[in-house]
Amino acid sequence: MELNSLKPAAGASKNRKRIGRGTGSGHGKTATKGHKGQKARSGGSIKAGFEGGQMPMHRRLPKRGFTPLAKKIYSVVNLSQLDVFETGSCVDIEAMQKSGLVKNVCDGIKILATGELTKALTVKAHKFSATARNKITSVGGTVEEI
C-alpha cells in the first residue's frame, strides 16, 4: 500500500455538478435554472421575507408591547423551599445562597406562597406576596423587607 494509491471508500465522495458545460453533460444549456423567470437571471435572488407582492408577514403583524427598561427581575423562592432551615433561624440572602435556593440575585429576592411552611422563621427578603406574608406570620415567624 502506498499513499499515492489510496482511494476513499465507495460512496464516501461525490463528484461535483459541473453546470453549463454543454448538453452532453446533462446540465448544459439552461444550467439547471429552468426557462426564463426572475431566478434564471443573473443576480435574480429574492429578498428574504418577500412574498411575491403580497404584504409580507413582518408587516402584517402588529407592533405591540414593549420591554420596560427599568423592569426589576426578582429571584423567586417558594415557602416549601424555606422548610430546609431550622426552626427559629434567620433566613436572609446569604443563607439562601449557601443552601443553594438562590444562585444569583439580580434585583432582589421575592418570597412566594407555593407550598407550606411548618417552622417559625425570620425571613428577610426584598419582596413578599401577600399570602406568603400571611403564611409565615401564621406559623409564628416574622417577615422583614430589606
From Swiss-Prot:
Residues 30-39 have a biased composition (Basic residues). One of its GO terms (molecular function) is structural constituent of ribosome. The keyword Transferase does not apply. InterPro entries: Ribosomal_uL15, Ribosomal_uL15/eL18, Ribosomal_uL15/eL18_sf, Ribosomal_uL15_bac-type, Ribosomal_uL15_CS. One of its GO terms (biological process) is translation. Keywords: Ribonucleoprotein, Ribosomal protein, RNA-binding, rRNA-binding. GO terms for cellular component: cytosolic large ribosomal subunit. Pfam families: Ribosomal_L27A. Disulfide bonds: none annotated. Residues 1-61 are annotated as: Disordered. The keyword Ribonucleoprotein applies. It comes from the Bacteria. HAMAP family: Ribosomal_uL15. Belongs to the universal ribosomal protein uL15 family. Binds to the 23S rRNA. Part of the 50S ribosomal subunit. This is Large ribosomal subunit protein uL15. The gene is rplO.
